[in-house]
């Protein structure tokens, strides 16, 4: 039965045994592949319906960055997406120690600072104080809604202290996120960056579609449009401390070689660095009229984040249209657009005397 497969706690594939107390399908490398394939298929449908704007901005939240690059910048084909996402998930999972039953010491919590009276500018300091007081690892890994929603990875002990402290101020100011036992996007995973960078180097084509990347792609790591400029290289370098960008001058490499190096650095350090979605959204809000989320209608996460963030920013409702590709497919596919009615018959136009030279039409007036 399907439920038996879903709950299966141990699976051996090609000599490797996978274990998870809630079922192996909860393991990162399997859940992320499933999500990536769905997103890839949804984007390909948009392409088939000719609804992808060739100059639109694109960004992906965490895992979504890979499918966005694959579908909108032609970086990977479907097989490549599956390979890289599986490798990414495996790298994350392998860096987390587990007991004989497959349990890890890590978890994740959602923090709502506004409910606990924590100012948006003080959220990082507040979390750091809890970590210092308890001696436990805690790190904000998803910056989702300014002042209202942040994901915090950490040890179970550290997160319990954080949740207890926040909820002592206001009930449900912090809640544990079920089903997560890997500290995604945290410094705990930095040990796996070099191996993942090698995998990216293996799978990335030597020449990239630069028109699809430059000025359009907004990486999680820096939350600003991708560029082949010295300023962009200098902005990425301290966030991707492999040393590969240190002292690099853009004129030393061809555009394709530079783009490829930057992409490897951006993506390999992405899984061990926070997702800067607040800044990404605020950038988009100042540049676009419509946002389309590629994702499931049953869980329109980014649609909800965008709508709430627009309200926080004080942007009037309706100024920017926010759609989910599955939930709002008629609007996304333009299927809700009615044909224009046939024009009423009109009389033949009557020629009028042209204006004299000293009677220029208003459009030509200075």
Where are these regions (language model features)?
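Short alpha-helical patches at coil-to-helix transitions and adjacent helical residues
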Residues: 32-40, 65, 104, 108
């Amino acid at each position: 039965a399907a439920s038996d497969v879903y709950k299966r706690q141990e699976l051996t594939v090609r000599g490797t045994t996978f274990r998870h107390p809630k079922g192996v399908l909860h393991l990162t490398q399997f859940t992320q592949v499933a999500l990536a394939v769905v997103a890839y298929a949804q984007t390909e449908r948009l392409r088939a319906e000719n609804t992808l704007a060739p100059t639109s901005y694109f960004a992906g939240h965490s895992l979504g960055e890979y499918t966005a690059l694959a579908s909108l910048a032609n970086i990977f084909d479907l097989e490549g997406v599956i390979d890289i996402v599986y490798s990414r998930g495996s790298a994350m999972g392998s860096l987390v120690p587990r007991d004989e039953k497959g349990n890890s010491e890590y978890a994740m919590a959602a923090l709502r600072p506004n409910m606990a009276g924590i100012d948006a500018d003080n959220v990082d300091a507040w979390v750091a104080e809890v970590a210092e007081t308890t001696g436990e690892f805690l790190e904000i890994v998803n910056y989702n809604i300014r002042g209202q929603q942040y994901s915090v990875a950490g040890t179970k002990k550290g997160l319990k202290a954080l949740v207890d402290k926040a909820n002592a101020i206001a009930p449900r100011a912090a809640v544990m996120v079920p089903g997560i036992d890997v500290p995604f996007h945290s410094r705990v995973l930095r040990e796996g960056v070099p191996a993942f960078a090698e995998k990216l180097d293996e799978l990335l084509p030597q020449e990239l579609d630069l028109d699809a990347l430059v000025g359009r792609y907004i990486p999680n790591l820096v939350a600003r449009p991708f560029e082949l400029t010295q300023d962009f290289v200098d902005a990425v370098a301290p966030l991707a401390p492999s040393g590969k960008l240190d002292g690099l001058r853009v004129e030393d490499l061809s555009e394709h070689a530079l783009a490829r190096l930057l992409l490897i650095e951006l993506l390999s350090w992405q899984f061990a660095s926070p997702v800067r979605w607040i800044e990404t959204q605020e950038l988009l809000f100042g540049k676009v009229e419509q946002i389309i989320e590629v994702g499931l209608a049953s869980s329109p996460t980014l649609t909800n984040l965008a709508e709430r963030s627009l309200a926080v920013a004080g942007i009037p409702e309706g100024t920017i249209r926010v759609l989910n590709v599955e939930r709002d497919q008629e609007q996304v596919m333009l299927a809700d657009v009615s044909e224009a009615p046939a024009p009423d018959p009109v009389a033949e136009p009557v020629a009028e005397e042209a204006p004299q030279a000293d009677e220029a039409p208003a459009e030509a007036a200075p």
